[in-house]
Each structure stands twice: as C-alpha cells, then as structure tokens.
Curated annotation (Swiss-Prot):
Pfam families: SMC_ScpA. This is Segregation and condensation protein A. The gene is scpA. Keywords: Cell cycle, Cell division, Chromosome partition, Cytoplasm. Belongs to the ScpA family. Participates in chromosomal partition during cell division. May act via the formation of a condensin-like complex containing Smc and ScpB that pull DNA away from mid-cell into both cell halves. One of its GO terms (biological process) is DNA replication. It is found in: Cytoplasm. Component of a cohesin-like complex composed of ScpA, ScpB and the Smc homodimer, in which ScpA and ScpB bind to the head domain of Smc. The presence of the three proteins is required for the association of the complex with DNA. GO terms for cellular component: cytoplasm. The lineage of its organism: Bacteria, Bacillati, Bacillota, Bacilli, Lactobacillales. It comes from the Bacteria. It comes from Streptococcus thermophilus (strain ATCC BAA-491 / LMD-9).
Amino acid sequence: MDIKLKDFEGPLDLLLHLVSKYEVDIYDVPIVEVIEQYLAYLATLQAMKLEVAGEYMLMASQLMLIKSRKLLPTVVEDEPEVDDPELELLSQLEEYAHFKAASQVLAKKHEVRAQYFSKPKVELVYEDVTLNQDKTIQDIFLAFSKIMAEKQEEIRRRHTTIARDDYKIEDMMLIIEEAFSAKNKLFLDELFSDAKDMNQVITLFLATLELIKIHRISVQQETIFGTITLRKEWTNE
C-alpha cells in the first residue's frame, strides 16, 4: 500500500485536499488548522523515512511563516500590507482549484469521446474504485498523522528513552488481528493505545495498511474529520 506524496500533483494539490474537507469557501477555511495538518503530514512521512520532495518543504517554510504571523498579536497599521502571504497563498489555491476542476471536465469529455471510437477498456469500470481507495488511504494517513503527534507528546511526557527497532510488520499484523478476536470493529486510535515507542506506532500503522491492502480489514469514516473505524472482514473459524 503506497503512501507517497506522488499521490498528489504538488504541494498545492495536498493543500487543496486538506481544504476541501471543510466544504467551505477557500477564503473561509481555518488556515492555521490546515497548515498544522500539512506540516503533520510531512513530519509523518519523514518519521517513516519516506522521501519528501523539495517543493513540499519549500511550501512548508512558507506555511510556517503564515502560521507565525497569524499567531502574533494583531497590530494596527496605518497602511494595509502590500504583500500578504496568506492572501497570496489562498489566491494561488483558488486558481489551482479552478484549473484542476477544468482539467477533470476535459478528461471526462475525452473519456466519453474515446468510447465512441474504440471498444471501452475494462479498466475504466474500476477507475472510480481506485480513486476512492486512494482517497480513503489519504484520509487514514491524515488521521494517523494526528495520532502520531499525540503519541509523541505522550511518550515525551513519560520520559521514555528506550526504543526498539526490531518490530516486524508481520508480528504487528497478528497483534491487530488478535485485537479483532472479540469484536468486529475498532477505532483506529485504539490500535496505538498500548504502543511503547514511536517505532512500534509506525510499524503498527504499516501493518494496518497491509491488512487493508489484502482486504482483511476495511475502513469507514462517516463524517469529515470524523473517527476512522476499522472493520474485520473475516469470520472467526
């Protein structure tokens, strides 16, 4: 199960994904929350030793500047600021959203026209399913970013310094399956409640993704930013 930034077309695409979950006008989104989610996403990728392209890190530095300015006390100025990085970013994001929507319309028209001139490919039937799965995986990854940040703080408060590095995905898969032995569903954050260090947290998450990939468990999120629920997809023998 690949969780990579290549799932997005660039930093603006990742930001648009985060913003779209609020279902409000781009200029009305809580920008600090969006920035924190973006930064948490990149931090999680780095913790999992996944490559982060330079363009995403450049955007991260710009977002941190915007966040710091938003958190500073408001100062009344005689003249409005000419260059507002927040408004500039939101304007870029709005322009990108229009561009992406237009490109999707063109792609759809091209797909329809292609069906008139050639035999429809079997793969077309499954394109929506694949896209929906990718979106689900992105959502679970974003949820994990929040869980990971909370676990880091919890482990820091416990002053835990000893960390193992020999956790195996296969072992964690068995532990997760054992957690389902007496129930058919679990909340995602329940899987990490007993984790002793960040290596175990990350390995548990990778094991969860593998179980999703082989259809041993399925994922549900009923509301935007809602709790991620994992469901068992096998019957006890």
